[in-house]
Structure formats: C-alpha cells, structure tokens
C-alpha cells in the first residue's frame, strides 16, 4: 500500500484501512500477524483499521473453536487489540472473535475499539450460515455459534458506523436499516470461500453500498488455511455510489483509502431510496 498523504485531513475525511489475513489454528500467532499489519496500516496514516471475520482463529474441526475460545473478559486477543489501539491512538474494528456465551457455543462477535482502548461497540453476527448441499456436505454455523439479535450503529467522532459480519451481506434489509439509523460507513468483515467469493463477493458489497448509500469496509480472510479451508481474499473499500476505492489480492496485507463522508449525503440525495419505502400486499404476504 502506498503511504497516505501526510497533510492534515478535512473534518469530513477519514483514512481507513483493511487488514487481510490468513488466520490459522492457534490464537497467539494470529494475534501477532494481525498486530503487525495493524501497525503497518497505522504507520501509513490510517485512523480507522478493520480486520476480518475470525481474526484470532480459523479451525473447522468440530468443537475446536469452542475448545480454544474464552469468555470476553478472558480473551487474549481482545486484550491485545485493546492495548494496541490505545498504543497507536487509532479506532480499531476487530472483524470478529469467537467469544463463549454458554456451555456449548460462542458468539461470532465484532468489537469496535476506541483510541483509548475502550470497547465502543459490540455486535454478534445475526445470520448463521446453515446449509446442506448433499448427504455428505453439511455445514451448520449455528451448531457452534449463537446468533445475535441486535443491529448496531456506533457513533464515533468522525462517522457513524454500522456493524455486520460475512453472511449478513446476503440480507439487504439489515444494511438499509443501519443506514436509516444513521450509519454512514458499514463494516462487513468476512471469510468468504473462494467459490462463493468469486461468484458473489464484489456484487454483494457493491449492491449493499448502493442500496444504503454508505461506504462499505470489507476486510477478508484469504488463501489456503491450515484447516484446509480456502477463502477468497479481495478485501474491498467501496464508496456510496458503488465505486471500488481499494481492493486487495489473494495474499495477506493491507489496503487503504481516504473517504470523504460528504459523499454519503450526496449519494443519498441523488438516489433517495431510503425515504421511499412503501407498504404493500399480495404475492401471499
């Protein structure tokens, strides 16, 4: 990533970065890998930095994530990232960590951390990816993770931000609701597979940005993981008109862009669809 210009930015401008990772089976090395990339992004001028879904651990073996997870107050990754945000004086969105919430399941939980190291917002992934493709190919995210039930918009000094995670991308009403609640920038950290990513990743993110008139910040997992999973990469930063402002490739690294938040109001003025919802009936509704 080329260094962001060092001149002071207008009040409406915000320098954001996505960290693209290939998280593995052990929490410690994943913390180290994420921290190194976060430091690099901060050194290059980013004020708000986001990491992907499951930053601290990817292990698809049944029960493995739960066995390696902890409660929020004991989570080593969360503690490390809170300290790092304070040290670097940045806003930090940790795409998600597995946080134990009962005796069998975790929450797939995002954390927005402020520059003093305090947790400004939490969001538990609402939509669980449960699918049976054939008799031998079944994936049930809900077996290991408890679904969230609350949409979240957080207020920061420069922008109102909405929080989502991965599979949430396929539910456009969530993004419209976040925008209606004031979100100007929406995070979509993810771990899309290579197959679904190639087919849908760019289309979904651009559509959600256009529909909501919001910036979309989508840090991704990438490549062949130690557990055998293959994720798509291609972290994206997208403007409210649907334009791609920055895109990663298929290797770990960072991308960045300088956002002008005035563009949110401009896009919504040109296409004011957020104010044009109507009730309707028919089609069996």
Language-model features: where?
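Active-site catalytic loop in hydrolytic enzyme cores
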Residues: 101-181, 194-203, 269-273
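C-terminal beta-strand edge segments of enzyme domains
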Residues: 2-3, 11, 221-285
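Residue-level recognition of beta-strand->loop/alpha-helix junctions
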Residues: 20-22, 52, 124, 220
């Amino acid at each position: 990533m080329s260094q962001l210009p060092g001149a002071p930015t207008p009040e409406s401008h915000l320098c954001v970065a996505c960290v693209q990772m290939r998280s593995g089976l052990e929490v410690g090395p994943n913390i180290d890998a994420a921290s190194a990339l976060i430091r690099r992004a901060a050194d290059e001028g980013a004020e708000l930095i986001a990491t992907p879904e499951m930053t601290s651990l990817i292990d698809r073996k049944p029960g493995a994530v739960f066995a390696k997870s902890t409660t929020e107050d004991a989570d080593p990754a969360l503690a490390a990232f809170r300290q790092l945000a304070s040290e670097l004086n940045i806003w930090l969105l940790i795409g998600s960590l597995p946080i134990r919430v009962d005796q069998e399941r975790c929450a797939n939980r995002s954390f927005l951390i402020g520059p003093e190291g305090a947790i400004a917002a939490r969001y538990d992934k609402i939509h669980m990816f449960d699918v049976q493709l054939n008799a031998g190919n079944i994936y049930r995210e809900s077996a290991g993770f408890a679904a969230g039930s609350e949409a979240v918009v957080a207020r920061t000094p420069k922008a109102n931000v909405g929080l989502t995670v991965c599979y949430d991308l396929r539910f456009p009403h969530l993004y419209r609701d976040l925008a209606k609640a004031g979100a100007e920038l929406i995070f979509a950290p993810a771990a899309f597979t290579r197959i679904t990513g190639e087919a849908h990743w760019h289309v979904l993110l651009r559509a959600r940005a256009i529909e909501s008139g919001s910036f979309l910040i989508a840090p991704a997992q990438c490549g062949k993981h130690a557990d055998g999973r293959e994720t798509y990469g291609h972290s994206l930063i997208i403007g409210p008109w649907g334009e791609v402002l920055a895109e990663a490739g298929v290797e770990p690294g960072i991308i960045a862009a300088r956002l002008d938040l005035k563009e949110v109001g401009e896009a919504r003025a040109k296409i004011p669809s957020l104010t044009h919802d109507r009730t309707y009936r028919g089609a069996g509704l």
